[in-house]
Design a protein with these regions (language model features):
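Short, surface-exposed beta-strand/loop "edge" segments at domain boundaries and coil↔beta transitions
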Residues: 42-49, 58-61, 132-137, 426-431, ...
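Metal-dependent DNA phosphodiester-chemistry modules and their immediately adjacent helices/loops
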Residues: 115-124, 128-256, 263
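Mixed-charge, glycine-rich, non-catalytic linkers/tails in nucleic-acid processing enzymes
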Residues: 193-341
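C-terminal effector modules of nucleic-acid-centric enzymes and ribosome-associated factors
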Residues: 123, 436-440, 444-532
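Accessory interdomain/linker segments of ATP-dependent helicases and helicase-like nucleic-acid enzymes
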Residues: 7, 285-429
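Structural motif
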Residues: 37-42, 67, 127-130, 423-424, ...
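Conserved nucleotide-binding/hydrolysis modules and their immediate coupling elements
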Residues: 386-478
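Long, charged/polar, low-complexity intrinsically disordered N-terminal extensions
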Residues: 1-122, 143-176, 180-181, 188, ...
Length: 532
């Protein structure tokens, strides 16, 4: 935790209200995000109980599994979910624009520019908290290898159409959520926690109701009191007024309301199956419908408060102006979405359960590179974030007190002006350490030369971005009296070493993938618990 974050938390405790840790919004928010509030069944890993899903805050679609242990009902739930999610994704897949991309020419081996399609926008999925992201990944894995009756007429318990496709998309969203700065799949508690500091622990910030109580408490109520009320207050039935954001449910809800309702549903279904004539079957069907309606009402009572809280949180975030580099990161999300769309269109198989060595190394390198890029861009976009880097000795700001023109040695001398900056910061500078400042959106480098006046003055030598002439371009060198900020971290991240092709994977990393990798993986084996 940075010093700025620590101070903000202390100030939140003192004032009774969450304090901002950012002056701009560092994540892109779509104009029409798809919000998903899922619930799972206690004791059944990954077994969905229900969900509220949709793009209209006033008209969410309620999906319910009245008996979560029934495979057919689970598949029906997933089919309904696919009917909502896939059309939403398709609205972005067809709207494209022309773009250029560097690719390797197979004949010459050189990098050349080619014109390709890029989706003009991309879908965005919002879940209440981090466990919601993990559930999306779990659902994606459980669905993408399923076989439909059309794909394999002999498969037992075939999946409904589009369920495997939904699994592939959810897997892509889940994988993209692991890339720092990506906004295709967002957990609202994490985004809110990035922009505000509360007076409670990071673990307590995972409770969406408590987090919002600190950020936007009722008039006259301290944040700590409002958060405690959100966590503990119960109604006359002993149920939480602000239920957990899911996907796990409150044990009191499971034991007192949900379990008896599911038992009544099971009894009604058994009675319907045992009905001996049409009149009795009509009566039993009415009982089954009433039991299912009761479960739907229970699920909606647990998901609707969270649904409203998610949209309230989005309103708070939209009040912040978007950071300058958030658009660039969203463009990379658009490229990712376009690439996955193209892979599906080309008929490629689902993502494997386990990545090969080269793919895994590439993913790890990408995440490390994107984390460094995100840290740098947030500081460049936000003076409050930059203040934290300055306190950590990773940047410094001050006033230019002197500029002395100097030149490099050699046949073609180049300008290397010496710039003296007066600063109250204490950056961790060493001999010939490079520092960077933003000049017209591009990083300009300088070398540390030395300190003067016990560190109050920092002398730098500017080394690039001054043009090709013997004299620096106008505006490329700081002038006396300018306020400037230099960082010790690079603004742009360089790509790592090129990894070998998959067929050239060294034996130290398992060797080239075998033929078995090319065979499409099958779904998990069917167990007795899958079907009632």
């Amino acid at each position: 935790m940075s010093l700025i974050s620590t101070l903000a938390r202390l100030e939140a405790v003192r004032t009774g209200r969450a304090q901002p840790t950012a002056t701009v919004r560092h994540r892109h928010l779509s104009e029409r995000p798809l919000v998903l509030v899922p619930l799972t069944t206690a004791g059944e890993a990954g077994a969905p109980l229900g969900a509220l899903v949709g793009t209209d805050r006033d008209a969410p679609r309620l999906l319910v599994v009245p008996q979560p242990r029934d495979r057919d009902l689970r598949f029906a739930f997933l089919a309904e979910l696919a009917d909502v999610v896939l059309p939403y994704i398709d609205t972005f897949a067809d709207d494209v624009e022309a773009a250029e991309r560097n690719e390797t020419d197979p004949e010459t081996g050189k990098r050349v520019k080619v014109e390709v399609e890029l989706c003009a926008d991309a879908p965005q999925l919002i879940v209440p908290s981090r466990p919601g992201i993990e559930l999306v990944r779990l659902l994606g894995r459980s669905m993408r290898f399923r076989r439909t009756a059309e794909q394999d007429p002999e498969t037992p318990h075939p999946a409904p159409p589009h369920v495997p496709l939904l699994g592939r998309w959810l897997t892509h969203f889940g994988e993209r959520a692991r890339v720092p700065g990506s906004a295709l799949l967002l957990a609202l508690t994490e985004v809110l926690g990035r922009h505000w500091a509360t007076g409670q622990s990071s673990l307590e910030d995972q409770h969406l109701g408590a987090l919002l109580a600190w950020i936007d408490p009722p008039d006259g109520v301290p944040g700590a009191e409002a958060a405690l009320d959100a966590e503990l207050r119960r109604d006359a039935q002993g149920q939480l007024v602000c239920p957990p954001a899911g996907p796990a449910t409150d044990p009191a809800f499971d034991n007192k309301l949900l379990a008896p309702a599911i038992e009544r549903y099971d009894r009604a279904r058994t009675a319907l199956a045992a009905a001996e004539d049409g009149l009795e079957a009509d009566d039993r069907l009415g009982e089954l419908t009433a039991a299912e309606r009761e479960i739907r009402a229970l699920v909606e009572s647990r998901t609707r408060p969270t649904w409203d809280a998610v949209w309230h949180g989005l309103d708070l975030l939209r009040a912040l102006p978007e950071g300058a580099h958030a658009v660039d990161r969203w463009t990379r999300d658009r490229w990712s979405f376009t690439g996955h769309r193209d892979r599906i269109t080309a008929g490629e198989p689902p993502q494997p359960r386990r990545d090969d060595a080269v793919t895994a190394a590439n993913k790890l390198a990408t995440r490390e590179r994107e984390q460094a890029r995100l840290d740098a861009q947030e500081a460049l976009d936000d003076p409050l974030v930059m203040a934290g880097r300055r306190l950590a000795g990773e940047a410094f700001a001050g006033e230019v007190t002197d500029v002395v023109m100097s030149y490099s040695e050699g046949k073609s001398p180049r300008p290397r002006p010496l710039v003296t900056v007066r600063t109250d910061d204490r950056p961790h500078l060493g001999e010939r350490v490079k520092v960077f400042r933003s000049l017209g959106g591009k990083p300009q480098s300088a070398e540390f030369v030395g300190h003067e006046e016990d560190g109050a003055l920092v002398v730098l030598r500017v080394v690039d971005k001054m043009g090709r002439g013997k004299e620096p371009d106008v505006g490329s060198v700081p002038e006396k009296g300018d306020r400037i900020c230099f960082t010790l971290f690079e603004h742009e991240q360089r790509g790592g070493a090129k990894l070998p092709d998959q067929e050239d994977t060294p034996w130290t990393h398992g060797g080239p993938p075998g033929e078995e990798i090319a065979v499409q993986e099958s779904a998990d084996p069917v167990t007795e618990e899958d079907v009632l």
